[in-house]
Protein backbone atom coordinates (compact mmCIF):
# COMPACT_ATOMS: atom_id res chain seq x y z
CA UNK A 1 0.00 0.00 0.00
CA UNK A 2 1.35 3.40 -1.02
CA UNK A 3 0.34 6.65 0.68
CA UNK A 4 -0.69 9.04 -2.09
CA UNK A 5 -2.08 12.05 -0.21
CA UNK A 6 -2.23 13.32 3.34
CA UNK A 7 -3.45 16.58 4.82
CA UNK A 8 -3.53 17.89 8.37
CA UNK A 9 -5.90 20.28 10.08
CA UNK A 10 -7.08 21.34 13.51
CA UNK A 11 -10.50 19.88 12.69
CA UNK A 12 -11.78 17.08 10.42
CA UNK A 13 -13.92 19.32 8.23
CA UNK A 14 -14.80 19.46 4.53
CA UNK A 15 -11.86 21.73 3.75
CA UNK A 16 -9.52 19.01 5.03
CA UNK A 17 -10.98 16.13 3.03
CA UNK A 18 -11.49 18.14 -0.16
CA UNK A 19 -7.90 19.40 0.15
CA UNK A 20 -6.75 15.80 0.38
CA UNK A 21 -8.65 14.99 -2.83
CA UNK A 22 -7.05 18.01 -4.55
CA UNK A 23 -3.60 16.74 -3.55
CA UNK A 24 -4.49 13.21 -4.65
CA UNK A 25 -5.66 14.45 -8.04
CA UNK A 26 -2.21 15.92 -8.78
CA UNK A 27 -0.55 12.55 -8.11
CA UNK A 28 -2.83 10.09 -9.88
CA UNK A 29 -2.16 9.01 -13.45
CA UNK A 30 -5.10 9.80 -15.74
CA UNK A 31 -5.86 6.13 -16.32
CA UNK A 32 -6.11 5.15 -12.66
CA UNK A 33 -9.40 4.91 -10.78
CA UNK A 34 -8.51 3.64 -7.31
CA UNK A 35 -10.76 2.80 -4.41
CA UNK A 36 -10.64 5.41 -1.65
CA UNK A 37 -11.59 4.06 1.76
CA UNK A 38 -12.85 6.01 4.78
CA UNK A 39 -14.80 5.63 7.95
CA UNK A 40 -18.41 6.86 8.16
CA UNK A 41 -17.58 10.42 9.18
CA UNK A 42 -20.13 12.99 8.08
CA UNK A 43 -17.63 14.68 5.78
CA UNK A 44 -17.24 11.43 3.78
CA UNK A 45 -21.02 11.09 3.44
CA UNK A 46 -21.55 14.67 2.30
CA UNK A 47 -22.87 15.34 -1.21
CA UNK A 48 -19.90 17.61 -2.04
CA UNK A 49 -17.37 14.88 -1.15
CA UNK A 50 -19.27 12.21 -3.06
CA UNK A 51 -19.63 14.51 -6.08
CA UNK A 52 -15.88 15.19 -6.03
CA UNK A 53 -15.15 11.44 -5.93
CA UNK A 54 -17.45 10.90 -8.90
CA UNK A 55 -15.82 13.78 -10.80
CA UNK A 56 -12.38 12.20 -10.17
CA UNK A 57 -13.71 8.72 -11.07
CA UNK A 58 -12.73 7.32 -7.68
CA UNK A 59 -14.59 4.42 -6.13
CA UNK A 60 -15.80 5.11 -2.58
CA UNK A 61 -15.54 2.46 0.09
CA UNK A 62 -16.70 2.98 3.68
CA UNK A 63 -16.20 0.94 6.80
CA UNK A 64 -19.30 -0.58 8.28
CA UNK A 65 -20.50 1.29 11.36
CA UNK A 66 -18.53 0.23 14.42
CA UNK A 67 -16.25 -2.12 12.47
CA UNK A 68 -12.63 -0.94 12.56
CA UNK A 69 -11.52 -4.17 10.86
CA UNK A 70 -12.89 -2.94 7.51
CA UNK A 71 -10.04 -0.44 7.35
CA UNK A 72 -7.27 -2.62 8.78
CA UNK A 73 -4.64 -1.57 6.18
CA UNK A 74 -5.27 2.13 6.79
CA UNK A 75 -5.30 1.69 10.55
CA UNK A 76 -2.02 -0.24 10.29
CA UNK A 77 -0.40 2.67 8.46
CA UNK A 78 -1.63 5.16 11.09
CA UNK A 79 -0.28 2.91 13.84
CA UNK A 80 3.09 2.59 12.10
CA UNK A 81 3.26 6.35 11.51
CA UNK A 82 2.60 7.07 15.17
CA UNK A 83 5.01 4.40 16.42
CA UNK A 84 7.83 5.04 13.96
CA UNK A 85 7.71 8.84 13.82
CA UNK A 86 5.07 10.93 15.55
CA UNK A 87 5.44 9.48 19.06
CA UNK A 88 9.19 10.17 18.92
CA UNK A 89 9.04 13.92 18.32
CA UNK A 90 7.45 16.90 20.01
CA UNK A 91 5.53 19.03 17.54
CA UNK A 92 4.44 22.58 18.30
CA UNK A 93 2.44 23.68 15.26
CA UNK A 94 0.28 22.40 12.44
CA UNK A 95 3.11 23.27 10.03
CA UNK A 96 5.48 21.00 11.98
CA UNK A 97 2.89 18.20 11.89
CA UNK A 98 2.49 18.62 8.12
CA UNK A 99 6.28 18.55 7.59
CA UNK A 100 6.64 15.41 9.71
CA UNK A 101 3.84 13.76 7.74
CA UNK A 102 5.47 14.66 4.42
CA UNK A 103 8.86 13.36 5.59
CA UNK A 104 7.35 10.15 6.92
CA UNK A 105 5.31 9.53 3.77
CA UNK A 106 8.39 9.96 1.58
CA UNK A 107 10.30 7.52 3.80
CA UNK A 108 7.38 5.06 3.94
CA UNK A 109 6.84 5.07 0.17
CA UNK A 110 10.45 5.21 -1.05
CA UNK A 111 12.81 3.85 1.62
CA UNK A 112 10.96 1.60 4.09
CA UNK A 113 10.64 -1.89 2.64
CA UNK A 114 7.80 -4.23 3.51
CA UNK A 115 7.88 -8.00 3.69
CA UNK A 116 4.28 -8.00 2.43
CA UNK A 117 5.52 -6.33 -0.78
CA UNK A 118 8.28 -8.86 -1.47
CA UNK A 119 10.79 -6.93 0.65
CA UNK A 120 10.62 -3.80 -1.47
CA UNK A 121 9.14 -0.32 -1.05
CA UNK A 122 5.59 0.61 -2.06
CA UNK A 123 6.86 2.76 -4.95
CA UNK A 124 9.14 0.03 -6.32
CA UNK A 125 6.36 -2.52 -5.95
CA UNK A 126 3.90 -0.28 -7.81
CA UNK A 127 6.44 0.37 -10.57
CA UNK A 128 7.03 -3.38 -10.99
CA UNK A 129 3.30 -4.08 -11.16
CA UNK A 130 2.70 -1.25 -13.63
CA UNK A 131 5.55 -2.50 -15.85
CA UNK A 132 3.67 -5.77 -16.34
CA UNK A 133 0.49 -4.09 -17.55
Can you annotate each of these PLM segments?
Residues 1-133:
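Charged DNA-binding/catalytic regions of mobile-element recombinases
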Amino acid sequence: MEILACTASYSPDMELVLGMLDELETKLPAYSHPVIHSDQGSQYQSPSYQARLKEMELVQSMSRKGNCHDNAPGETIFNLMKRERLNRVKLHSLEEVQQELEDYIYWFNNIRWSNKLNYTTPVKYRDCVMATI
